[in-house]
Protein backbone atom coordinates (compact mmCIF):
# COMPACT_ATOMS: atom_id res chain seq x y z
CA UNK A 1 0.00 0.00 0.00
CA UNK A 2 1.21 3.48 -0.87
CA UNK A 3 0.39 6.65 1.06
CA UNK A 4 0.85 9.97 -0.75
CA UNK A 5 1.93 12.48 1.91
CA UNK A 6 0.68 15.47 -0.05
CA UNK A 7 -2.44 17.48 -0.79
CA UNK A 8 -1.31 17.97 -4.40
CA UNK A 9 -4.07 17.33 -6.91
CA UNK A 10 -1.60 16.96 -9.81
CA UNK A 11 0.30 14.18 -8.01
CA UNK A 12 -2.98 12.53 -7.09
CA UNK A 13 -4.10 12.61 -10.72
CA UNK A 14 -0.78 11.16 -11.93
CA UNK A 15 -1.14 8.17 -9.61
CA UNK A 16 -4.81 7.68 -10.51
CA UNK A 17 -4.09 7.80 -14.24
CA UNK A 18 -1.44 5.10 -13.82
CA UNK A 19 -3.83 2.99 -11.74
CA UNK A 20 -1.45 2.91 -8.78
CA UNK A 21 -3.36 2.02 -5.62
CA UNK A 22 -2.82 4.63 -2.93
CA UNK A 23 -4.44 6.76 -0.27
CA UNK A 24 -3.77 10.48 0.07
CA UNK A 25 -3.04 12.04 3.45
CA UNK A 26 -1.68 15.57 3.63
CA UNK A 27 1.47 16.07 5.71
CA UNK A 28 1.29 18.82 8.33
CA UNK A 29 5.00 19.62 8.16
CA UNK A 30 5.93 23.32 8.30
CA UNK A 31 8.03 23.90 5.18
CA UNK A 32 9.27 27.29 6.39
CA UNK A 33 11.30 25.57 9.13
CA UNK A 34 13.88 24.35 6.58
CA UNK A 35 16.61 26.89 5.78
CA UNK A 36 18.65 24.93 3.21
CA UNK A 37 19.89 27.32 0.52
CA UNK A 38 20.87 24.80 -2.16
CA UNK A 39 17.76 24.39 -4.33
CA UNK A 40 18.53 20.79 -5.30
CA UNK A 41 19.07 19.77 -1.66
CA UNK A 42 16.11 21.82 -0.44
CA UNK A 43 13.66 19.90 -2.63
CA UNK A 44 15.01 16.61 -1.26
CA UNK A 45 14.97 17.71 2.37
CA UNK A 46 11.40 18.99 2.13
CA UNK A 47 10.26 15.72 0.55
CA UNK A 48 11.89 13.77 3.38
CA UNK A 49 10.38 15.93 6.10
CA UNK A 50 6.89 15.57 4.61
CA UNK A 51 7.14 11.77 4.51
CA UNK A 52 8.89 11.56 7.88
CA UNK A 53 6.32 13.79 9.58
CA UNK A 54 3.50 11.54 8.39
CA UNK A 55 5.36 8.37 9.41
CA UNK A 56 5.56 9.68 12.98
CA UNK A 57 1.86 10.53 13.20
CA UNK A 58 0.48 7.57 11.25
CA UNK A 59 -0.71 5.75 14.38
CA UNK A 60 -3.19 8.58 14.96
CA UNK A 61 -4.73 8.15 11.52
CA UNK A 62 -7.60 5.82 10.68
CA UNK A 63 -6.20 3.53 7.98
CA UNK A 64 -7.84 0.81 5.86
CA UNK A 65 -7.58 -2.73 7.25
CA UNK A 66 -5.49 -3.90 4.29
CA UNK A 67 -2.68 -1.64 5.53
CA UNK A 68 -1.69 -4.54 7.81
CA UNK A 69 -0.75 -6.76 4.89
CA UNK A 70 2.59 -6.32 3.19
CA UNK A 71 4.95 -3.33 3.26
CA UNK A 72 3.69 0.23 3.49
CA UNK A 73 5.29 3.07 1.56
CA UNK A 74 4.95 6.73 2.52
CA UNK A 75 5.76 9.04 -0.41
CA UNK A 76 6.79 12.63 0.13
CA UNK A 77 7.50 15.01 -2.76
CA UNK A 78 8.42 18.64 -3.15
CA UNK A 79 8.95 20.59 -6.37
CA UNK A 80 11.01 23.74 -6.81
CA UNK A 81 11.58 25.60 -10.06
CA UNK A 82 15.06 27.02 -10.58
CA UNK A 83 15.65 29.87 -13.01
CA UNK A 84 19.21 31.15 -13.42
CA UNK A 85 20.15 30.00 -9.92
CA UNK A 86 17.08 31.48 -8.23
CA UNK A 87 14.29 29.45 -6.65
CA UNK A 88 10.85 30.31 -8.01
CA UNK A 89 7.99 29.22 -5.79
CA UNK A 90 4.41 30.32 -6.29
CA UNK A 91 4.20 34.00 -7.36
CA UNK A 92 2.86 36.23 -4.60
CA UNK A 93 0.61 38.15 -6.99
CA UNK A 94 -0.06 38.83 -10.68
CA UNK A 95 2.58 41.54 -10.86
CA UNK A 96 5.30 39.16 -9.70
CA UNK A 97 4.01 36.46 -12.05
CA UNK A 98 4.27 38.88 -14.99
CA UNK A 99 7.83 39.89 -14.12
CA UNK A 100 8.89 36.25 -13.85
CA UNK A 101 7.27 35.27 -17.13
CA UNK A 102 8.96 38.19 -18.90
CA UNK A 103 12.28 36.74 -17.74
CA UNK A 104 11.39 33.12 -18.55
CA UNK A 105 10.00 33.89 -22.01
CA UNK A 106 12.22 32.22 -24.62
CA UNK A 107 14.50 30.83 -21.90
CA UNK A 108 14.77 27.61 -19.91
CA UNK A 109 14.85 26.58 -16.27
CA UNK A 110 14.99 23.46 -14.15
CA UNK A 111 12.18 21.79 -12.26
CA UNK A 112 13.60 19.87 -9.30
CA UNK A 113 11.36 17.38 -7.51
CA UNK A 114 12.63 15.79 -4.33
CA UNK A 115 11.28 12.28 -3.73
CA UNK A 116 11.33 10.34 -0.47
CA UNK A 117 9.84 6.88 -0.05
CA UNK A 118 9.80 5.62 3.53
CA UNK A 119 9.20 1.87 3.67
CA UNK A 120 7.93 0.04 6.73
CA UNK A 121 5.32 -2.21 8.27
CA UNK A 122 2.36 -0.97 10.28
CA UNK A 123 0.78 -3.10 12.97
CA UNK A 124 -2.63 -1.71 13.91
CA UNK A 125 -2.80 -3.95 16.98
CA UNK A 126 0.27 -2.42 18.58
CA UNK A 127 -0.05 0.88 16.67
CA UNK A 128 3.59 0.71 15.66
CA UNK A 129 5.09 1.68 12.30
CA UNK A 130 8.49 0.05 11.91
CA UNK A 131 10.66 1.66 9.23
CA UNK A 132 12.75 -0.78 7.20
CA UNK A 133 14.17 1.49 4.48
CA UNK A 134 14.25 5.09 3.25
CA UNK A 135 14.86 5.91 -0.42
CA UNK A 136 15.57 9.49 -1.49
CA UNK A 137 16.34 11.22 -4.77
CA UNK A 138 15.94 14.59 -6.46
CA UNK A 139 14.92 14.28 -10.12
CA UNK A 140 15.56 17.29 -12.35
CA UNK A 141 14.00 18.20 -15.70
CA UNK A 142 14.95 21.06 -18.01
CA UNK A 143 11.96 23.10 -19.18
CA UNK A 144 12.11 25.32 -22.29
CA UNK A 145 9.59 28.15 -22.63
CA UNK A 146 8.18 29.69 -25.79
CA UNK A 147 8.95 33.30 -26.67
CA UNK A 148 5.79 35.12 -25.62
CA UNK A 149 4.31 38.52 -26.34
CA UNK A 150 3.30 40.64 -23.35
CA UNK A 151 -0.39 40.17 -24.13
CA UNK A 152 0.03 36.38 -24.07
CA UNK A 153 1.68 36.55 -20.67
CA UNK A 154 -1.06 38.81 -19.33
CA UNK A 155 -3.80 36.57 -20.76
CA UNK A 156 -2.27 33.54 -19.06
CA UNK A 157 -1.80 35.31 -15.73
CA UNK A 158 -5.42 36.51 -15.82
CA UNK A 159 -6.50 32.84 -15.64
CA UNK A 160 -4.91 32.82 -12.13
CA UNK A 161 -3.33 29.43 -12.83
CA UNK A 162 0.26 30.72 -12.40
CA UNK A 163 -0.51 31.90 -8.86
CA UNK A 164 -1.01 28.33 -7.64
CA UNK A 165 2.03 26.66 -9.22
CA UNK A 166 5.71 26.41 -8.38
CA UNK A 167 7.49 28.46 -11.01
CA UNK A 168 4.23 30.10 -12.07
CA UNK A 169 3.22 27.51 -14.66
CA UNK A 170 1.37 24.21 -14.92
CA UNK A 171 2.45 21.78 -17.63
CA UNK A 172 -0.79 19.83 -17.29
CA UNK A 173 -2.91 22.97 -17.44
CA UNK A 174 -3.26 26.08 -19.57
CA UNK A 175 0.46 26.76 -19.27
CA UNK A 176 1.30 23.61 -21.19
CA UNK A 177 0.94 25.41 -24.52
CA UNK A 178 3.72 27.83 -23.57
CA UNK A 179 6.31 25.09 -23.06
CA UNK A 180 8.48 24.30 -26.10
CA UNK A 181 10.08 21.11 -24.87
CA UNK A 182 11.26 19.17 -21.83
CA UNK A 183 14.55 17.39 -21.35
CA UNK A 184 14.32 14.66 -18.75
CA UNK A 185 11.35 13.12 -16.99
CA UNK A 186 8.03 14.55 -18.23
CA UNK A 187 5.89 13.65 -15.20
CA UNK A 188 8.56 15.10 -12.90
CA UNK A 189 7.53 18.56 -14.12
CA UNK A 190 4.05 17.81 -12.78
CA UNK A 191 5.45 16.96 -9.36
CA UNK A 192 6.28 13.26 -9.42
CA UNK A 193 8.69 11.12 -11.45
CA UNK A 194 6.61 8.06 -12.32
CA UNK A 195 9.59 6.04 -13.63
CA UNK A 196 11.44 6.60 -10.34
CA UNK A 197 8.36 5.63 -8.33
CA UNK A 198 7.63 2.53 -10.42
CA UNK A 199 11.19 1.24 -10.06
CA UNK A 200 11.18 1.62 -6.29
CA UNK A 201 7.68 0.26 -5.73
CA UNK A 202 8.67 -2.88 -7.65
CA UNK A 203 11.92 -3.16 -5.71
CA UNK A 204 10.07 -2.92 -2.38
CA UNK A 205 7.19 -5.16 -3.55
CA UNK A 206 4.58 -2.52 -2.78
UniProtKB/Swiss-Prot annotation:
It holds the Pfam family Maf. One of its GO terms (cellular component) is cytoplasm. Keywords: Cytoplasm, Hydrolase, Nucleotide metabolism. GO terms for biological process: nucleotide metabolic process. InterPro entries: ITPase-like_fam, Maf-like. Its cofactor is a divalent metal cation. This is Nucleoside triphosphate pyrophosphatase.
Amino acid sequence: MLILASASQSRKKLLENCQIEFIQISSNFDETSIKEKNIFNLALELSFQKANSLSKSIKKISLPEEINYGPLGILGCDSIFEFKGEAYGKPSDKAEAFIRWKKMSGEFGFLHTGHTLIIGNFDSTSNIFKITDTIKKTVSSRVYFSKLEDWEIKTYIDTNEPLYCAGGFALEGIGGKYIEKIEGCFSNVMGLSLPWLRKNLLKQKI
